[in-house]
Amino acid sequence: MQFLKYLLILAILMLLSGNIYSQELSTSAVSGLWDKLDKEIINGTIDKSDAEDLMEEYEPYVIRYFKEQNGKTVKKSEWVFPLNNYTSIYYRENGNDYRDENYDYFQGSNTKGHPAHDIMILDDNKDLLDDSTLKPVDIVSMSSGVVVATDTTWDIGSLLRGGKYVKIFDVTNNGLFYYSHISVVSVKPGDVVNAGDKIGEVGRTGRKAILKPGKTHLHVSFLISENGYPVPEEFITELRYAEKNNNLNNK
């Protein structure tokens, strides 16, 4: 009888803890939890299956939060170019730098491949300013979504590959945008952004980007969520289309 009472008490405590956890997830706090998870993935301090389960669990709460905050729907055809206030840009390897072979999101900071595009700005002296305007080049969100992870602490000597970064969950297109090598991060986890909102400034942060051969650029990727598993997707067509529209609008 005593043992049965113990089991009953234990069951009640587990139910209560589960309810408390769900209440936490039902608020904007879920972005803070995602940010914490993101750093555990990068540092390799969490099991892959556990990380995948948590991402799958967090996503519905992020989507709900986005809708509660009246986030705007932005289709792929409405994506905007991720840079603003620049004189000229060019793509690494003319946009042929996307490689997703052997890539796995849960490899953390030691991911293989390059499932992204690098966009260089005009900065020959590498002072992080556009050589013509003498001003920083803004990074803007390509779509709408919720900021779920950032890094603002990177410093020289850090082994973090992407340096300072921003990750935004695109609710409309069920995917994750990753912007990295940022010099100044302008958003925080929990922020709801629209297409064109400033999220940072182009830089050279990161364990390789900061080295002498490194160029001032933005590294940007888009990953479709498949039940919590971020799978990279080639998006050069959408990127060039957005660039073309940006150039037309700035004439």
Identify the function of each model-found stretch.
Residues 1-8:
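Bacterial N-terminal signal peptides that target proteins for export
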Residues 22-138, 238-251:
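Polar/charged, compositionally biased leader and regulatory segments
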Residues 117-131, 175, 180-182, 222-232:
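Small beta-barrel nucleic-acid-binding modules, principally OB-folds
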Residues 138-150, 187-202:
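Short, well-structured beta-strand-loop connectors
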